[in-house]
Design a protein with these regions (language model features):
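Charged alpha-helix within mobile-element recombinases
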Residues: 4, 14, 66-75, 85, ...
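Short, basic alpha-helical/linker "hinge" immediately adjacent to a nucleic-acid-recognition surface
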Residues: 4-80, 84-92
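Short, surface-exposed connector motifs at secondary-structure boundaries
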Residues: 6-7, 187-191, 214-219, 269
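Conserved short alpha-helical interface segments
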Residues: 17, 74-135
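Mobile genetic element proteins and their domesticated derivatives, centered on retroelements
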Residues: 22-25, 69, 82, 103, ...
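Mobile-element integrase/transposase regions
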Residues: 122-179
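Active-site beta-loop-alpha junctions of metal-dependent nucleic acid enzymes
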Residues: 171-175, 192-216
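Acidic/histidine-rich, metal-coordinating catalytic segments
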Residues: 218-231
């Protein structure tokens, strides 16, 4: 068509394309106004595609960086955690740098296969809204002798003094199994607790068993929702000496640290997990990995690092 000296408008009309599209394509593959080389345009398209895919850094060109990124992804670190920790681990090595966006870009353009599937599964599921965890009609009944969150010491809200925890249960398949979760508000240290059942007595004893292992200065308070599984809170307090305060109904933000952490835990135990089939080893491995992740809110230190500094200071 160009050889026939037809205009861009005429070519666009014949091909059912916009004139601007024809103009850009010819500009990309032309030697002059009236010659178009499809192979030249294709080669340029491939080069541009590679640049877009590679992002600022191409991990395939830096094996050491690639191994580092893969290793941390398999520990379920976020791309931001990886990028920030690289700066700490290699402060003078510019070659060991990559942005979070470049990691995402690299992963999503990997060829389809087992490796891509494995690495993408390590990324967090960024839902816009987290579903409320319903406790049923029983959750609306007030627990006997419960202390309201309004009565909490002010130091709990300030997060300056460690030893204040938030607790919850992650419910498993068919609402028949569960995993207890505890998160320390200052250090973000997480404890995962296998429970025999969701009965109040079993939950209180399981939580107490783990809390008793903590240094005394790290056992001050616990904030929980008004679920019936914590109806034996007085038994828990008797065993541990830790007072339990209860958040208001339908107010997950009052235990925001725990709610956020439950989302992270779902990376290891997705919704629908049957916790009766999850071994204690699997639970503790997930706990270890969670506490070994650098956190933005901790200036990219890990919960383990901050916890150890506080109890040894």
């Amino acid at each position: 068509m160009l050889a026939q000296k037809r205009s861009f408008q005429s070519i666009a009309k014949s091909l059912g394309r916009y004139t601007s599209t024809i103009s850009r394509e010819i500009a990309a593959g032309s030697c002059n106004k009236y010659t178009y080389r499809a192979n030249k345009a294709q080669a340029r398209a491939i080069r541009n595609s590679h640049k877009r895919r590679a992002g600022r850094y191409d991990l395939d060109d830096n094996l050491r960086l690639k191994r580092y990124v893969y290793r941390k992804l398999r520990l379920k670190w976020s791309t931001t955690q990886i990028a920030k920790t690289l700066e700490k681990d290699y402060p003078t090595d510019i070659g060991m740098r990559i942005s979070p966006e470049s990691i995402y870009t690299y992963l999503f353009v990997l060829p389809k296969g087992t490796l891509k599937k494995e690495l993408l599964a390590c990324l967090r599921q960024n839902r816009k809204h987290r579903r409320k965890q319903r406790r049923g009609v029983e959750a609306k009944r007030k627990l006997e002798d419960m202390l309201s969150i309004e009565e909490c010491p002010k130091e709990v809200e300030d997060r300056i003094i460690p030893g204040h925890w938030e607790g919850d249960l992650i419910v498993g398949k068919n609402n028949r199994s569960a995993l207890g979760t505890l998160v320390e508000r200052t250090t973000r240290t997480t404890i995962l607790i296998p429970v025999k059942s969701k009965s109040a007595t079993d939950v209180a004893k399981a939580f107490a068993r783990e809390v008793k292992k903590l240094p005394k200065q790290m056992r001050l308070t616990m904030t929980y929702n008004q679920g019936r599984e914590m109806a034996s809170h007085k038994l828990f307090t008797k065993i541990t000496g830790v007072k339990v305060y209860f958040a208001n109904p339908r107010s997950p933000w009052e235990r925001g640290t725990n709610e956020n952490t439950n989302g992270l835990i779902r990376q290891y135990f997705p919704k629908g997990t049957d916790f009766t089939k999850v071994s204690r080893y699997e639970v503790k491995r997930a706990q270890h990995q969670l506490n070994g992740r650098p956190r933005k809110t901790l200036d990219y230190q890990t919960p383990y690092e901050v916890f150890d500094k506080l109890i040894n200071s």
